[in-house]
Design a protein with these regions (language model features):
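Disulfide-stabilized netrin-like
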Residues: 53-57, 62-146
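Sec/Tat signal peptide C-region and signal peptidase I cleavage site
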Residues: 21-25
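N-terminal secretory signal peptides that target proteins for export/translocation
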Residues: 1-6
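Intrinsically disordered and other compositionally biased segments
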Residues: 7-10, 45, 84
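Bacterial N-terminal signal peptides
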Residues: 9-20
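Generic marker of residues within folded, mature protein domains
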Residues: 15, 26-28, 49
């Protein structure tokens, strides 16, 4: 029969079992890079002073992993230029885009794991007519022609 001489003799075995659980690092959110044309801004953006929000817009992908697909993309505080975001989302959202205009071609870095990066309000005027499509969150937005 197995007997323990001291309670401390279990510590090395316990440490070996629990250590992998303690050091699991959170994996970075996977990203998707696409070139897409902004085809629909369904309404007016709320005022930034009211609350922090992400606003869903519709794009037609013209390059990258999802070529020729129509996608819905949430942008954090779209009234602001991407470089002017200065709150706690500055470390998440970037790019050189100054404003969102229908017809503009954008280079976007997206994540399909929106709730991992944004847990706040989402203004989604597509929700009533399209509940099935995935909503992507934009991490970086630039004009595709670099202007």
């Amino acid at each position: 029969m197995f007997t323990l001489r001291t309670p401390c003799s279990l510590l090395p075995a316990l440490a070996l079992l629990l250590c992998p659980l303690a050091v699991q690092a959170k994996q970075p959110t996977p990203t998707i890079d696409v070139t897409a044309r902004l085809v629909n801004i369904p309404g007016k953006f709320p005022a930034d002073e009211l609350y922090d929000y992400a606003y869903v817009m519709q794009y037609q992908v013209e390059g990258g992993a999802m070529d020729k697909q129509t996608i819905l993309v949430a942008h954090y505080k779209p009234r602001r230029a991407r470089a002017e975001i200065d709150d706690n989302m500055k470390k998440v959202v970037g790019g050189s885009l100054r404003r969102f205009e229908v017809g503009a071609l954008h280079r976007l870095t997206l994540t399909a794991s929106m709730r991992e990066v944004w847990k706040g309000a989402v203004v989604d005027e597509f929700f009533d007519t399209d509940r099935k499509s995935k909503r992507y969150f934009c991490l970086k937005a630039d004009l595709a022609d670099g202007k």
